[in-house]
A protein has these predicted regions:
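Conserved class I S-adenosyl-L-methionine
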Residues: 1-44, 60-64, 83-86, 90, ...
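A short glycine-rich, Lys/Arg-flanked "PGG" loop and its adjoining helix->strand segment in the class I
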Residues: 130-142
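Short, glycine-/aromatic-enriched active-site segment of Class I SAM-dependent methyltransferases
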Residues: 151-169
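A short acidic, Gly/Pro-enriched loop at the edge of an enzyme's catalytic core
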Residues: 105-116
Length: 221
C-alpha cells in the first residue's frame, strides 16, 4: 500500500471523523486508559505545567492534565474536526484547556513552551515522522518530556495487518527503531517499556503478551 502524503492524512482524518460520529471515541478512550495512564504519570506534571496531547481524540488526557496542572495549560491537537468537537463538548467548563484541529506537524502553538507532550497511537500514521518528531523537540522546553505510545510496532505481530484492515498506510518500527528516531530528533530516551494488561483483563491476547510500547524521551536541560 502506497498513499501520497496528503491522501494518507485525509484518510486518517476521515477514519477518525467516522469513529467520532459513531461514538467510538469513548470506547477508544476507555480501552486506551490502562495503557496511557502509566505514560501520563511518567511525565511528572507540576501544578503549573504546560501539557500537549498530539492526537487527543475526545480529550481525555487533556482533562487529566487540566486536573493535574491547574495552574498550567492543557492543549489537545487532532486531525479530526469531529474529535475536536467531542473534546470541546466533554471539556466544557474547564478554563485551562484548549483544542485545535491540526494535521501535525502543522499547528498553531509556540515553540519552547511545553513541559510535557504525550501521543498515543498517532506517530506511525504521519507521512513524515522525522519532521514530526523534530517539531516535538521544538515544542518542548529544555528538560521537557515526550511520552510516545504505539500498539502498531514490530514485536507486536498481531498489529501487522492493521494497515490493510483500516485502509491507511502506517510506518512500522520495532522498539529499537522507536528509540532511534526519538534520539535522532534530539531527545534522550530515558525509558522504554511495554505496558501490559493482566490476561483476564485483556480483550485481545496481544494486550497481555505484547502490550503498548512506551518510549519516553527527554530534551536536554
Amino acid at each position: 500500500m502506497t498513499q501520497r502524503p496528503d491522501d494518507r492524512v485525509d484518510r486518517v482524518r476521515r477514519v477518525f471523523d467516522d469513529w467520532a460520529e459513531r461514538g467510538r471515541d469513548e470506547g477508544m478512550a476507555q480501552s486506551h486508559t490502562p495503557f496511557v495512564r502509566p505514560a501520563f504519570e511518567s511525565l511528572d506534571l507540576r501544578p503549573d505545567a504546560w501539557y500537549l496531547d498530539i492526537g487527543c481524540g475526545n480529550g481525555y488526557t487533556v482533562r487529566w492534565a487540566a486536573e493535574a496542572a491547574p495552574e498550567g495549560k492543557a492543549v489537545g491537537l487532532d486531525v479530526s474536526e469531529r474529535m475536536i468537537e467531542r473534546a470541546r463538548e466533554m471539556s466544557a467548563g474547564l478554563e485551562n484547556v484548549e483544542f485545535h484541529r491540526a494535521a501535525f506537524p502543522v499547528h498553531p502553538l509556540p515553540h519552547d513552551a511545553f513541559d510535557a507532550i504525550l501521543s498515543m497511537e498517532v506517530f506511525y500514521y504521519l507521512p513524515d515522522m522525522d519532521a514530526a518528531l523534530a517539531e516535538v523537540a521544538r515544542l518542548l522546553k529544555p528538560g521537557g518530556r515526550f511520552a510516545c505510545m504505539v500498539d502498531f510496532y514490530g514485536e507486536n505481530e498481531a498489529s501487522h495487518s492493521w494497515p490493510e484492515d483500516v485502509g491507511v498506510e502506517m510506518t512500522l518500527l520495532d522498539s529499537a527503531g522507536w528509540r532511534r528516531v526519538l534520539e535522532e530528533a534530539g531527545l534522550e530516551v530515558i525509558d522504554q517499556r511495554r505496558v501490559l494488561l493482566a490476561a483476564e483483563e485483556a480483550s485481545e491476547p496481544w494486550k497481555a503478551t505484547e502490550g503498548s510500547l512506551l518510549t519516553l524521551g527527554q530534551m536536554p536541560a
